[in-house]
Amino acid sequence: MNGAVLIADVVATSAAITATRSRKAKVAAIADLLARADPRRSGADELETVTAYVGGALRQRRTGLGWRGLTKLPAPAPGPTLSVLEVHEAFERIAAPAGAGSQAARAAAVADLFGRATAEEQQWLRGVVTGEVRQGALDSLVQEGLAAAAGVPLPEVRRAAMLAGSTVAVAAAAFEGVAALGAVGLQVGRPVLPMLASSAPDLAAALARAGGDEVAVDTKLDGIRIQVHRSGPDVVVATRSLEDITARLPEVVEVARALPADSFVLDGEALALAEDGRPRPFQETAARTAMGAGVEVTPYFFDVLHLDGADLLDVSAAERAAVLERLVPAEHRVPRVVTADLGVAEEFLAGALRSGHEGVVVKSLAAPYEAGRRGASWVKVKPVHTLDLVVLAVEWGSGRRQGWLSNIHLGARDPATGGLVMLGKTFKGMTDEVLAWQTERFLELETSRSAHVVHVRPEQVVEIAFDGVQRSTRYPGGVALRFARVLRYRDDKPVAEIDTVDTVRSFLG
């Protein structure tokens, strides 16, 4: 059944968003498009599809398509006729084939879809498949547009999306009103977006944000973020990107089932330890959670979001900590000290570093659990300054690096526009093993190339160490990193969680 909104409408909105740097104009364009998909007229399916598409994403997690499969397309249609629902149904058919004959079936479905699309629509469809739709419509902008279109408060939309795990999941509820959004609550077994920490250059700066009040200082473990849900015997273990990894971590499931409660939601880290109790290299923990085989991991928890029918998101961190202490034994809690004294905090940080950990996270004791938000309530402090950035492009190496992709172009999020801002390049910190891996990885993400540069889909997150930040007119963000070097690639982190250019600017002297 054809929907009222055409894919041409999405393409036009995408172009309008790309053409302006004004956040207000971007939000207005998104709101206008979403209003045309009002579910009270055309149903929730169309609205959810439009919401996903204006954010530059498909509703299917995987389609089996890559940019190489889109190099030979049929001639474009002379005029726009495709609805968003027809495109969604086409991608359902494209994603479905498996087994013998699946490639031919997928190719036929692709040819049928693209043959019905205009030249502009073909370009947009190719971009959304390959991740090139960079109109700056990040999720926060889509949420603002949804709130405006539905006439509901933005905080209500944000909260519901965080608890449901996506904006698409609550789009229809927004048009039903505040009561429907308020009915979206934490559901045991359905992961929520995790609370995130901002950065500070040192402990003094982190404690200053608390205004002299006592804070919790947690050890920052160098593991994989996990969220553990239990309802009776049923346990779900999810990553920070909400991927279900329960089957890969039976030892975490065992710990969860042993806790003295019927239902709960815990936030924490999974960490692989050496025989002396020190953390193993991060790559070993990451490999274990990704593949389900390898070294054993131990869960450590630092927060509780729900216990036996009671949601705890809105209670203070101090109250949640008391609940956590009653529920989880000390050997599975992240080490913590509560203090307002800088000397005590610095001594605790030194002890964490001696034990092989990354640093500390300073947490307000009065704050609620702000799912999906990065704010001043949690502040991480590490002796080595690091940023999580995204790779925008890579340059071919020379000399002994001939034939390898070497110099990576680094980008941060611009919260003002929703786009990505380049901060500089680096080829430092790369072993031969890393060079070989990233060459293969970035060729998989390639979208185009020039003589020396391979442009890639902005999907790969990299953790960068740096010595400082300086003002620069060379890059659009007005800042550049000094002595940037690769610490590691972070396959566990989605691009939505990379650092902002504002965070980078906070490190200016």
UniProtKB/Swiss-Prot annotation:
The active site is at residue 220. It is an enzyme of class 6 (ligase). GO terms for biological process: cell division; DNA biosynthetic process; DNA recombination; DNA repair; DNA replication. ATP binds at residues 218, 225, 240, 269, 302, 374, 380. Its EC number is 6.5.1.1. Its cofactor is Mg(2+). It catalyses: ATP + (deoxyribonucleotide)n-3'-hydroxyl + 5'-phospho-(deoxyribonucleotide)m = (deoxyribonucleotide)n+m + AMP + diphosphate. The keyword Nucleotide-binding applies. PROSITE patterns: DNA_LIGASE_A1, DNA_LIGASE_A2, DNA_LIGASE_A3. The keyword Nucleotide-binding applies. Keywords: ATP-binding, Cell cycle, Cell division, DNA damage, DNA recombination, DNA repair, DNA replication, Ligase, Magnesium, Metal-binding, Nucleotide-binding. InterPro entries: ATP-dep_DNA_ligase (IPR050191), DNA_ligae_ATP-dep_bac/arc (IPR022865), DNA_ligase_ATP-dep (IPR000977), DNA_ligase_ATP-dep_C (IPR012309), DNA_ligase_ATP-dep_cent (IPR012310), DNA_ligase_ATP-dep_CS (IPR016059), DNA_ligase_ATP-dep_N (IPR012308), DNA_ligase_N_sf (IPR036599). One of its GO terms (molecular function) is DNA binding. HAMAP family: DNA_ligase (MF_00407). Belongs to the ATP-dependent DNA ligase family. DNA ligase that seals nicks in double-stranded DNA during DNA replication, DNA recombination and DNA repair. This is Probable DNA ligase. It comes from Nocardioides sp. (strain ATCC BAA-499 / JS614).
